Amino acid sequence: MIINKIFDTAIIGGGVAGCSLLFTLARYTDINNIILFEKYDEVSQLNSNPKANSQTVHVGDIESNYTLEKAKKVKESSSMIKNYIENFQEINITGFKSDKMLLAVGEDEIKELKARYTEFKELYPYLELWDEKFLATFEPKLLENRKEPIMAMGARGQITTVDYKKLSESFIQKSLDTDKNIQMRYNEEVTKITREEDGYYKITSDTTNFRAKSIVVNAGAYSLLFAQDMGYGEEYATLPIGGSFFFTKEKLLNSKVYTMQNPKLPFAAIHADPDCTQNWNTRFGPTAFALPKLERYHSLHLKDLINALNIDKDVTQVYMNLFKDSTIRRYIFKNAIEEIPFIGKEVFVHDAQKVIPSLKVSDLTFAEGYGGMRPQIIDKKKHELLLGEAKISKNGIIFNMTPSPGATSSLAIAMQDTKAICQYLSKSFDLEKHQREIQMLEKNAPSSIEDIKNVV
């Protein structure tokens, strides 16, 4: 079989992570030959699709599970997405402005919210505390049939919502608009990566072979499988977590409404989001449950699943530790029940009523075709879940395992990977141009984004 020409960099995976990297390499480096592989017929068919996520820009201002230090890093990395949307005139195309809030219910949560506002208001000076009088006119549904006192910490007129599929398509088009040799390989699945004696990489797809000097694998749950096939990352395993949503039958809220996080739970608390794919009707969720699939709504590849689970005594110990905690155990069982037809929304409505107390079961419909898979990485040596971005980087090849909300940090992760690839290939990264267009910094201003590992 004839091996095609050598590319400087190959990107495996056409989600928002892969597309943002393509954009960053094409626009801000002197790397000339880049190829991107996407096994489906369009980009962002899986977790970056607006049906598979909450369409949220996670800034750290209303996410109550973020510490102040984590919020500082998240704010800087997420600002790149917001800057791109504004600087490249993508408002109301890929990104949308609206209001958002963190809702506290009951005296204990209100006390916690006030303390959080005091701690975070310097980092996010636009945040406001909203009492019941304000909320009664601003979002009246929050108070209908409400017995407990409430308060919110919110922001008005921010970029809150992003269609990450359209954003991915925008990144692709901006890349193709450069003078670089960009090749997009749709409907082409990479099946194997090997390093050859000359140090270059051979990429075997289901149609042919290619060669590349460097590779970045942004393939969701499959990134770890590619790494382990090459002998890397054997200390990791994957716990595939699925998430589902419920729609209301009409638009009930104008704002994104997040709720206070239970510190014992590793997954996001319920939130309500106006959905850009459904005329801004309210979408509640997500649920979170273990699902024996690597890709939601796609065929099950049993061999890949078994390899990803990588079950041994260390992985089993992590599972046992999770089930030992009664709070997590109840949460897992409840979320599993919420997936059962007809019964599910009877259970889920009680969670949703924390946001809208007057909500009835008849107001909800299961969001068929919505939801995705989030590959949570297990560190077998430490016997714990890695709740954030995991990265393996060796000899010019990078494997990214980025669960939700990695889309928010995609441009920051792309910058980090671009710097690494440029160093490996002895190429140049135009930091000044990137600061001006994406980081929105003045000339020669420093950037603190050097290592965003475990930020998302």
Please annotate each region the language model reported:
Residues 7-35:
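N-terminal Rossmann-like FAD-binding beta1-loop-alpha1 element of flavoenzymes
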Residues 54-138, 291-293, 297-303:
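Dinucleotide-binding Rossmann-like beta1-alpha1 core, especially the glycine-rich loop
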Residues 317-432:
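C-terminal catalytic lobe of FAD-dependent flavoproteins
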